[in-house]
From Swiss-Prot:
Gene coding for it: recO
SUPFAM superfamilies referenced in this protein's UniProt entry, alphabetically: ArfGap/RecO-like zinc finger (SSF57863), Nucleic acid-binding proteins (SSF50249)
GO biological process: DNA recombination; double-strand break repair
Entry protein name: DNA repair protein RecO
Cellular component terms (Gene Ontology): bacterial nucleoid
InterPro entries referenced in this protein's UniProt entry, alphabetically: ARFGAP/RecO (IPR037278), DNA_rep/recomb_RecO_N (IPR022572), NA-bd_OB-fold (IPR012340), RecO (IPR003717), RecO_C (IPR042242)
Family the entry assigns: Belongs to the RecO family.
Record region (Disordered): 1-38
Length: 275
């Protein structure tokens, strides 16, 4: 990324990640059992608004992704009033500093400040941002913090805002999302522990990982070139084949892990840009 893009990342410098190595099986990692509902007051937490909806006559419920507390729901009292200071602050795709109080699953927003330093999304980049938000809502459980995922979401928005190719940005985000929510599998070796070879063909078992292509594989498993898998492992999408096959693979995996639940924004992207 450019120096300008790097500057955009400074407001929310994430703490060092201490995640475990990626596992070969997609069995989800146990949810953190920390009793987050016992926390009464949190001040100035880095956050992004993922979604909001009306609550009673003058308020909103905002679904937010926070760096250290995961995804939580907050009541923004009076946010729908015409002259509320919150109306211009609680915007999607903008870095915020939020404070809240309460012990229930629905906390009360007590403060919100716009941090700034990020360009707004527009056009295709805006649609991609909504797609990323929908994935976060679908895959991230309440109060299950993933600081590395929070930081990569920030990077994703920055890359989109600076006009980087959406296909590459989304594939990178999808892989980090699956890794952080417990579905990580290596792409550079097979389930038999053999190194993936660039000139061979493979299938992807959603429960175990990369397998040699063969007649015993279900027909709906995507057939992927070894070169594509190796490129994806290195986050390299300059080959046209890698772009096309990685899209097929990630669409298959996301659909499988979501139990076939459709993504509204994914269909919009398919219809408009085939992303």
């Amino acid at each position: 990324m450019t120096d300008e893009a790097d500057a955009d990342l400074q407001p929310f410098a994430a703490p060092p990640a201490t995640g475990a190595p990626a596992a070969d099986k997609p069995a989800r990692k146990p949810r953190r059992a920390a009793p987050r509902t016992s926390e009464f007051r949190i001040a100035e937490q880095p956050a992004f608004v993922l979604h909001s909806y009306p609550y009673r006559e003058t308020s909103l419920v905002i679904d937010v992704l926070t760096r250290d507390h995961g995804r939580i729901a907050l009541v923004a009292k009076g946010a729908k009033r015409p002259h509320s200071a919150l109306r211009g602050v609680l915007q999607t795709f903008q870095p915020l500093s939020l404070s809240w109080s309460g012990k229930s699953e629905l906390r009360t927003l007590t403060g919100a400040e716009w941090v700034g330093g990020m360009l707004p999304l527009a056009g295709d980049a805006l649609l991609c941002g909504f797609y990323a938000n929908e994935l976060l809502v679908k895959f991230c459980a309440r109060e299950d913090p993933h600081p590395p995922l929070f930081q990569h979401y920030l990077v994703t928005l920055t890359r989109l805002a600076h006009g980087e190719p959406p296909v590459q940005v989304l594939r990178s985000f999808e892989r980090v999302l699956l890794r952080e929510t417990g579905y990580a599998m290596t792409l550079k070796r097979t389930v038999a522990r053999r190194a993936v070879e660039p000139d061979k063909l493979y299938v992807f078992d959603p429960q175990r990982g990369v397998r040699d292509a063969g007649s015993d594989a279900p027909s709906h498993w995507p057939v992927i070139a070894g070169q594509t898998l190796l490129d994806m492992e290195e986050d390299d999408y300059h080959r046209a084949q890698t772009v096309a096959q990685s899209k097929t693979l990630m669409r298959f995996l996301l659909n499988t892990y979501l139990g076939g639940t459709p993504l509204a924004t994914r269909q919009i992207l398919i219809d408009l840009q085939n992303l």
